[in-house]
Regions:
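Short, conserved SAM-binding/catalytic segment
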Residues: 51-54
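Acceptor/aglycone-binding surface of glycosyltransferases and processive sugar-polymer synthases
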Residues: 62-78, 83, 95-166
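Short beta-strand/loop segment that forms part of the nucleotide-sugar
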Residues: 32-40, 60-61
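Short, well-formed alpha-helical segments that are part of the catalytic scaffolds
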Residues: 14-27
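Cell-envelope/extracellular polymer assembly enzymes that use nucleotide-activated donors
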Residues: 4-6, 33
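Donor nucleotide-sugar binding loop of glycosyltransferases
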Residues: 14-17, 41, 94
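A conserved acidic beta->alpha catalytic loop
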Residues: 38-47, 91
Length: 166
């Protein structure tokens, strides 16, 4: 039996990136459902999404609510996949990483990419890198977590594990 894979995307003003991101996801992931939650982008992101011809694409446009956490929850509620993934909408170039990440779910409950381990990388400006590292350090200390990059923009996990936690 082939497992269904869901990738959740949250968008706000991603008109320049969203089509490429979805194209890359479709190219690299089998049995794929894509759930996009748009926060009423004024740049036409939602209109672009409506024109994408992919039968397993679900699109939601929120008029008042905003934010990543609530977008993820809305996407999760409306998803059907055995695996649930998240990708920042402007990170389509990383879609090629998902097949290996999904394969690693045979041995792990969650798989994420980290900017802060050997082989990782962060191309943002120095202020954003420092701020991100500080947030991650404080979060790891408070949560007593060994995960190096709690704010990673790409992860995948088993649906069952996620629902057990919720």
């Amino acid at each position: 039996m082939n497992k269904k894979n869901t990738i959740i995307l949250s968008t706000y003003n991603e008109s320049l990136a969203i089509e490429n991101t979805i194209t890359e996801l479709i190219k690299h992931i089998k049995n794929l459902e894509i759930v996009v939650v748009d926060d009423n982008s004024p740049d036409g992101t939602f209109e672009i999404l409506k024109k994408i011809n992919y039968p397993h694409l679900k699109i939601f446009c929120r008029k008042k609510t905003r934010g990543l956490a609530s977008a993820f929850l809305l996407g999760l509620i409306n998803s059907e996949g055995d695996t649930i993934g998240w990708l920042d909408s402007n990170m389509g170039s990383l879609a090629s990483k998902f097949p290996e990440m999904i394969s690693n779910l045979n041995d792990f409950d969650i798989v994420l990419l980290s900017r802060y381990v050997h082989g990782g990388g962060d191309q943002r400006n120095k202020v954003r890198i420092i701020a991100s590292k500080m947030v991650n350090y404080i979060s790891r200390f408070i949560l007593r977590s060994k995960i190096k990059d709690l704010t990673s923009g790409i992860f995948v996990m088993k649906r069952k594990v996620l629902l057990d936690v919720l």
